[in-house]
């Protein structure tokens, strides 16, 4: 898989890569009550992604996923959204497996890559079904986060 426009159709769901636009991204985020972004934040987020994919049902967007990272050592599933009306139908699994295949296509021979994510509380079992492990483990510490705000002058 290269960074290209691609399409896959499974069970009346079309998956298109690198065709997610700002308005669709913002709309899907809103439908799952995620934090509101400015259009500029959304545009930059999409432009700086390694890949974006969007799931369509009857030509309507019902889900999306977005990957960021360096494409060599670490890739990160940054967003995975499925609108509530179609959750539980396997669309999230389709998108996540697509992302895993994409990341695998980037691995240099003889090396490995970490595919990371932070899941919403209560969604751990979904990701564990797809081979992800919860941290901390015996060898890996906990994931951490720091929220940054605009620096105030003065």
Specify the residue positions occupied by each region the protein language model found.
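Short amphipathic alpha-helix that is part of the acyltransferase structural core
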Residues: 2-39
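Conserved beta-strand in the GNAT
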Residues: 54, 60-69, 73-76, 81
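Residue-level recognition of the GNAT/N-acetyltransferase active site
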Residues: 83, 87, 120
